[in-house]
Structure formats: structure tokens, C-alpha cells
From Swiss-Prot:
Keywords (A to Z) from UniProt: Cytoplasm, Molybdenum cofactor biosynthesis, Transferase
Record's protein name: Molybdopterin synthase catalytic subunit
Organism taxonomic ancestry: Eukaryota, Fungi, Dikarya, Ascomycota, Pezizomycotina
Pfam families linked: MoaE (PF02391)
Gene coding for it: cnxH
Record has Protease as a keyword: no
GO term, biological process aspect, one: Mo-molybdopterin cofactor biosynthetic process
Residues binding substrate: 123-124, 139, 146-148
Pathway(s) served: Cofactor biosynthesis; molybdopterin biosynthesis
Residue runs in coiled coils: none
Species whose genome carries this gene: Phaeosphaeria nodorum (strain SN15 / ATCC MYA-4574 / FGSC 10173) (Glume blotch fungus)
Catalytic activity: 2 [molybdopterin-synthase sulfur-carrier protein]-C-terminal-Gly-aminoethanethioate + cyclic pyranopterin phosphate + H2O = molybdopterin + 2 [molybdopterin-synthase sulfur-carrier protein]-C-terminal Gly-Gly + 2 H(+)
Biased composition (Polar residues): 1-10
Location of region: Disordered: 1-21
EC code(s) of this entry: 2.8.1.12
GO cellular component, one term: cytosol
Length: 188
């Protein structure tokens, strides 16, 4: 779903990080600055011969339009669950050692980190493939949205993935509400 919003709209952002961590997976949605070094430390392991770190930063333009700011929001319980499933599947598929996916919520100034993904694996090819897949799956599936504000005040909410301004989220708001309902029913 995508809508134009007034610049005065403020999404509900948790004041503290929301996390889910095991020995091999760390998932975090945070209003704080992202710590790529902490993500790298988490995935470090004596059994890993490779560590891949991806740091996504906010751009100052989208489709030749000047972006003045970005703000991220999510339905945190569902997004944490989705990100954990993504990480778990990637660990198994690529025989990785550990993975961390950390995403910024709230205002994210231009040039600042919005996502950090760290992956370790016994061999570099698996780590490279896993890191890229983690990013693409996160952008495609995680319940995270961004408000892009453009120079001149116009703002557009859209899915947290590359695409066209105003690109509709699959299933629209009805699809999202259905996913939240199913999540709530299975996690009561």
C-alpha cells in the first residue's frame, strides 16, 4: 500500500529495541543508531572462515526526486517473526554459522544506516549468497514500511523495497490486515 501523507504524521515507533536472539540468530528493530561492529561480533565464530557485512544507507534521491528524509515503521511483533524465519531459512539453506539482521525504525537521516546484515559461514561463497538473500528477503517480506519525504514536502508511504514511487504493497491493506490477524491468532 502506498499513500501520500502530510509531513506532520508520526508513526508509532518503539522507544527501545525489539529483539529476538538465539545462539545463531540475532534479529533487531531499533530506534537507535545501528551498530555494525556489534553485528559483526555476534556472527564471529571459530568455525566460520568468512564474515560478510552489508550496511544499507539512506539515499538522497529516488527516481530523480530529491529525498529530504526517511522514516521507517513496522508492526514489530510480526516483523520480528518474519525476519527470524528468513534468518533461520538462510542459515539452513546456505549452511551458515550465524546471522544478524538489524533494521532502523523511526527517522533515518540521509546517509545514515537503515539496515545491517552480518552473516558468517565456513566458506565465503555461502556467506556472500546468504547476505544478499537475507537483504532481498527482508525487503520483500518483512512488515517494514518507509515514509519517503521529498523536497517540497510531499511524502509517500511504501513498502521497504526498491521500486516505483507509490508501488502498492502486495495484497494492499486487506492483505496486511489478514497477515496481522493470522499472526495474532497463532501467537495468543
Amino acid at each position: 500500500m502506498s499513500t501520500s501523507e502530510t509531513s506532520s504524521y508520526t508513526p508509532d515507533i518503539p522507544s527501545e529495541p525489539v529483539t529476538k536472539t538465539t545462539d545463531t540468530i540475532h534479529i533487531e528493530l531499533t530506534p537507535n543508531d545501528l551498530d555494525s561492529l556489534a553485528a559483526t561480533r555476534f556472527v564471529r565464530s571459530p568455525s566460520a572462515g568468512a564474515t560478510v557485512l552489508f550496511i544499507g544507507t539512506t539515499r538522497d534521491s529516488f527516481n530523480d526526486k530529491a529525498v529530504s528524509s526517511l522514516s521507517y515503521t513496522s508492526y514489530a511483533p510480526l516483523a520480528i517473526s518474519t525476519l527470524y524465519k528468513i534468518a533461520s531459512n538462510i542459515l539452513t539453506k546456505h549452511a551458515c554459522t550465524k546471522i544478524a539482521i538489524i533494521h532502523k525504525l523511526g527517522e533515518c537521516p540521509i546517509g545514515e544506516e537503515s539496515i545491517v546484515i552480518a552473516v558468517s559461514a565456513p566458506h565465503r561463497k555461502a556467506a556472500w549468497l546468504a547476505g544478499e538473500e537475507a537483504l532481498e528477503e527482508t525487503k520483500d517480506k518483512a512488515e517494514i514500511w518507509k515514509l519517503e519525504r521529498f523536497e517540497g514536502g510531499e511524502g509517500v508511504w511504501r513498502a521497504n523495497r526498491d521500486g516505483k514511487v507509490g508501488e502498492r504493497v502486495d495484497g494492499g491493506i486487506a492483505g496486511l490486515l489478514g497477515r496481522i490477524e493470522v499472526f495474532a491468532d497463532t501467537n495468543v
